[in-house]
Amino acid sequence: MTNIWLLSLIFVICILVAVFNHKNRRNYQRTPPSPPGCPIIGNLHQLGELPHQSLWKLSKKYGPVMLLKLGRVPTVIVSSSETAKQALKIHDLHCCSRPGFAGARELSYNYLDIAFSPYDDYWKEVRKLAVQELFSSKQVHSIQPIKDEEVKKLIDSISESAAQKTPINLNKTLLALTVSVVCRTAFSVNFEGTVLNSERFNNIVREALEMLGSFSASDFIPYVGRIIDLLTGLQGRRERSMRDLDAFYEQMFDLHKQKKEEGSEDFVDLLLRLEKEEAVLGNDKLTRNHIKAILMDVLLAGMDTSAITMTWAMAELAKNPRVMKKVQSEIRSQIKNKERISFDDTDKLEYLKMVIKETWRLHPTTPLLIPREAMSEFEINGYTIPVKTRLHVNVWAIGRDPDTWKDPEVFLPERFTDNNIDAKGQHFELLPFGGGRRMCPAVYMGTTMVEFGLANLLYHFDWKLPEGMKVDDIDMEEAPGLTVNKKNELILVPTKFLDP
């Protein structure tokens, strides 16, 4: 009997010690600093229309690792290159999955795309497929004739405006260019003159990107949040955006069948063939919804991001005549009197590459990288990041960090002279395409499109402000959304520089 009591006592003591150690361990865990929030909504009210700017201001007070409570969801914001490196490289495998979001769930057919899919075998296989068939260096070089043709059309169109001294809306002009290139690349269809080549299509793209980037109450406040989304009209906007996109996908499939250009199998052909063969990616049999979700990434991101970067670059150049003159001088001295700029010509344009990097620094197309979700516990700067915590990397804030960049608000491409900083995800001071396993797979395609487009605009034309407008009148306000474009349209007047 004595032995039984002794064993029981030892067992109880062991349990108490284990509980004490667990509580003690939790007490030693460091929680990132956090701004005070409100009951129920937490810090949601502090995000504002442009969350990346609001979070940047908060980080000045609370530091580069900051914890917010967005409703009931713990969310960590990192705002420096060092903390981004810890999240995206050192602890990449701990936090490379995606949390659920209402907008992404609906527009990606329940996370069947690449960008918003959780980290699993399906994501690995579909990303690999997209890289091999669409985004590889070989594929990018193979579509150069398409870019040559579309840029020639652009130059001819602008030349007509220049002859009449008509101002150009560069937001719309550059979006039309990237739409044409991406659609011909993915669908082998020239959409010029079709229903897809319209202002309505551009509006659908912008609305979808805004829905993907919006902070929805239903994502953070269970039950009540959905009612809030219904009352504010956000749920209706998401459903309408989904219907509009789905209808356009179907129209694209129809156009693809009717007007397909002659040539080898394109990306859509491949996906449709895999669907017919009942191919399996991960544990999923490929369906039409899988194809639409994958195309959402290709179309929305591919069309929008390159156009946004070119628009911001032209805005900064118009605002900084010294830089405009210097980059045009480089391009024209290297290209001489050639009628057209070739793909290989852009390799020589070092200052243009600096201009693009500086544009990415100040105007990253995705200022808040798509959030990650912690799959296991890890630490950043000694702060514990628990499982299921959401993690945002504020690329916009990193580009304005005075500890990394001297005079961060000044547009100064020369800051990239004699350094090896690039946008390939290994230099965490500059992350326009993200980093780690979830880095955008279209880095090479996006970079070459921006270089080629800007080189042609700056080679063939001089650009002036409309009559009566001064440099200080150029505003740099941002529009909300997953990707952030210039809020107000950039209007410039082209003057033909070279008549081949």
From Swiss-Prot:
SUPFAM superfamilies: Cytochrome P450. Disulfide bonds: none annotated. The chain crosses the membrane at residues 1-21. It is an enzyme of class 1 (oxidoreductase). Heme binds at residue 440. InterPro entries: Cyt_P450, Cyt_P450_CS, Cyt_P450_E_grp-I, Cyt_P450_sf. GO terms for molecular function: heme binding; iron ion binding; monooxygenase activity; oxidoreductase activity, acting on paired donors, with incorporation or reduction of molecular oxygen. Its EC number is 1.14.-.-. It is a single-pass membrane protein. Keywords: Heme, Iron, Membrane, Metal-binding, Monooxygenase, Oxidoreductase, Transmembrane, Transmembrane helix. Its cofactor is heme. GO terms for cellular component: membrane. It comes from the Eukaryota. PANTHER family: CYTOCHROME P450 71A9-LIKE ISOFORM X1 (PTHR47955:SF19), CYTOCHROME P450 FAMILY 71 PROTEIN (PTHR47955). Belongs to the cytochrome P450 family. This is Cytochrome P450 71B34. It comes from Arabidopsis thaliana (Mouse-ear cress).
